Structure formats: C-alpha cells, structure tokens
Amino acid sequence: MAKTNSTSKNNKLEIKSVFAYQAFDSRGFPTVACEVVLNDGSKGLSMVSSGASTGEKEALELRDGGTKYHGKGVTKAVNNINKKIGPKILGVDATLQTQIDEFMIELDGTKTKAKLGANAILAVSMAVCRAAAKSLNLPLYQYIAKKVAKVKGADFILPVPMLNVINGGAHADNTIDFQEFMIMPVGAKTMAKALQMASEVFHSLQKLLKAKKFNTNKGDEGGFAPNLKSAEEALDLMSQAVVDAGYALGKDVAFALDCAASEFYSKEKQAYVFKKAVKAGILSEEKGTKTTEQLISYLEDLTKKYPIVSIEDGLDENDWKGMESLTKKIGKKVQIVGDDTYCTNPELTSKGVSLSATNSVLIKLNQIGTLTETIQTINIAKKANWTAVVSHRSGETEDAFIADLAVALSTGQIKTGSMSRSERIAKYNRLLAIEMQLGNKAKYLGSKTFYNLSTPAATPKKSPAKKTTKAKSKK
C-alpha cells in the first residue's frame, strides 16, 4: 500500500507491526485474532466472530478444511494476514481506515473476499481501528463516530437490546424451528434499567421453565433451549415471565423474532417446512408445511396475539416478492429486518431499499468483512428511513467491538445474545461502561427507537395468566 504524505517515521500513528494468530470462539472452533501495533506502542486487538446459519451472499469465511478442528481451522487466513496483508500496510497511517480497507479489498480482488478471507480482512480492519483510537486516547465509539464515520452531533444513542431468551433453529438442539425469541426492554429510560429488566425477565423465565418441568439447557447464544411444541408456546412462556418479573407486556417489554426462514425453506417443495417439529412428531408433514402466503398470514397472526415489534428473516433470503408482501402487510407496525437477504452488503441493501422489501437491515461485520463497508450499509439504511440493528454471531468472542459500533453510529438497536455466557455479557457490560462515561450525553430511546413505525409495541390481545401477586409495571 502506498504511503501518504501524512506518514513519516515520526508519525505516532504509523503501523509498526501486524500479527495474527488462531484463537477460539464461543463454540470452541478456531477464529482469527489480530494485533496491530503503532509506532507509539498503541495496540489494537481484534477477534472475529462466526455464524451458524449463514446467508448465501456472505463474504467468504476462509477455513482450512481437512481433518484438524473438523476442517474449521483458520491458519490460511492467519497466514494471509502475516504474509500478505500485514507487510503491505506497515508504515501506513492507521487513521486512514477507509483507504486501508479499500486496499485490502483490492488486494483480495474477489467479490466475496474469497482469496484472503473475509475473516482475515475484518480482523485487520478492526485491529487498525482500535489501535488508532487508543493512540488518540479516544473511546472506540467516539473514534469511529468522529474520525471514521464522520458523524455530526454531540449526543450518542445507546441501543435497545434484543435479548435472545429462547433459542431454536440452527442455534439449539431442540424442536423449535424459529431461531430466536427475543425480549426488548422498550419501556426503560436508561441502558442500566434496560439490562435490569432483561435480567429479571430472563431469571423469571428460568424459574417458570423449571416449574413446568422443561429443561433449562442453553443454546449457542445463551438463551434457553427447551423442547417446545410451537412458537406460540415459546411466546406464552415469555409473556408469563414478563408478568412474573413485574412488567407490562408491550409497554415495558416487547418481543422480537428471528425466524431464519431460509433454514427451513425447501427448494424442492417450494415451501416452508417446520422440519424440526415434523421430525419430533409434533406436526405432520402436511401441517408443518406452509406456502409463502400461509407463512405471512401465520406471522401476522402472531403479531396480533403478542407484542411483537420486530421480525427478522421471516421468509427465505431469496424470496424478494414474499418479503415485499410481508412488509406491505405488517411493516407499518412491525420492524421487518433483512439479514440473510442483505448480508450487510451495500449493493444488496440498496436493492432492498429500491424494492421496499423490508424496513430494516441487520448489521454483521463479518458478513461483509470491513468496517468501511459496514458503515456504508448503515448509512444507506438510515438515508432510506430504515432502522439498522447491529448484531453478534452465534460463534462469538469476548471482543465487544459491536457495542462501540452501535453507539458510534447511533443505530438504536443491538442484538447480542441472552443474559448468560460471558461472550454475550461482555457487550452489555461495555454498553454500561459507555453509558456511565457519556453521562447526560447518552440517550436511550426505548420504544422511540422504532422511528419508522406508526404503532410499535402495541398491547397484545392475548394475555398470560396473572401472577400470583398482582404484577405492576416497574418504574
């Protein structure tokens, strides 16, 4: 990479060394870690996450194949950093984030980053960013906002968390086909209060599951993974847990779903098959199979019964017409999030905007592979009056970069797992630290985060059984 005029031997932001190694994610599989050191000694360490249910259009995560680690090793990606990327960015000003990212994209030369690996490129992108922030003595979120994304304004919006309390689909070995059942503390006024509410509902749910003789095993993202008969049963249990914790459904705590419908879409049948429920004998194959229209109607019915404010990947990632229909039908009151459809790709997100396919985009750094392209996607969504939800992956690490990213871009929402497993809690603890640091400059919007919906978080028509002692909305 060509050096710029701003770079000299005396420039404290000059990249001095780049070193990558193989670390482990929360599932015990290898992942890429990278350390970038600047001339002044400032260090930036990054660790890349990995998904279980992945979109067809994601940038390529380079794995070794073979027998070691069941083919999941990442020594190829590590070597690409140490031998191909690192040597070419030595001496470059670390604040040139966009130029460094664009150089790595050009060096790779493929549309999906298949040559060097998106996991290799992202590890360097994140580590460079963190090293520069440390050198300038700026919190990471502030550095990203002011120096990388060029965000204007003094206030930062803290994200409303989507907490995955019941896991299914590819994230759990149980009978539920929908992948994530989440709670959102929309009635809170601060991040601290939001996480208090989330913790209390989470533990109330655990007590409820035990009382009803369900197992309380955990899925990949820290939520419970009981064998349930339907999405309704999961939502009923969540509703009861909210009431047991002393909160009001819809007003204090709303629900969000990640259907991950591509995982149970049958190309052969051109239909959606709840295969886990069918395999368990809960549903016959006939009753467990739905057309696009039937699945849309089913999702609409769920939003009428429960305080669901967000549905992610309600249909197959390539079912553009179906997504348009879903958004047209319930998109005024429910956030319709595209994950696998867009894969944090600016071009695909622009296509979705032009079609009004959804009204929100999920943001996953490793789907696209650079911080620069991630910011581009968020900006495309915001310009279209869409929301953007910053997200973790099921194979996570203790790296809390996404917490800073959500605050830096004021996305207003973050999806980063349940109230268990330290790789998930690391993000929440980071958000608490940011809130304390910002003081009165920190804004938590609650239900107002759904700025493009007309009537979010409506009170559900279906109410759970009352708590033994009358539940009151906690203030």
UniProtKB/Swiss-Prot annotation:
Binding site for (2R)-2-phosphoglycerate: 179, 364, 393-394, 415
Location of the active site: 221 (proton donor), 364 (proton acceptor)
Molecular-function GO terms, alphabetical: magnesium ion binding; phosphopyruvate hydratase activity
Domain of life assignment: Bacteria
EC number(s) stated in the UniProt entry for this protein: 4.2.1.11
GO CC entries: cell surface; extracellular region; phosphopyruvate hydratase complex; plasma membrane
Known pathway: Carbohydrate degradation; glycolysis; pyruvate from D-glyceraldehyde 3-phosphate: step 4/5
Coiled coil regions in record: none
Its job: Catalyzes the reversible conversion of 2-phosphoglycerate (2-PG) into phosphoenolpyruvate (PEP). It is essential for the degradation of carbohydrates via glycolysis. 'Moonlights' as a plasminogen receptor. Binds host (chicken) plasminogen; enolase antiserum inhibits M.gallisepticum adherence to chicken embryo fibroblasts.
Family note: Belongs to the enolase family.
The protein's name in its UniProt record: Enolase
Lineage: Bacteria, Bacillati, Mycoplasmatota, Mycoplasmoidales, Mycoplasmoidaceae
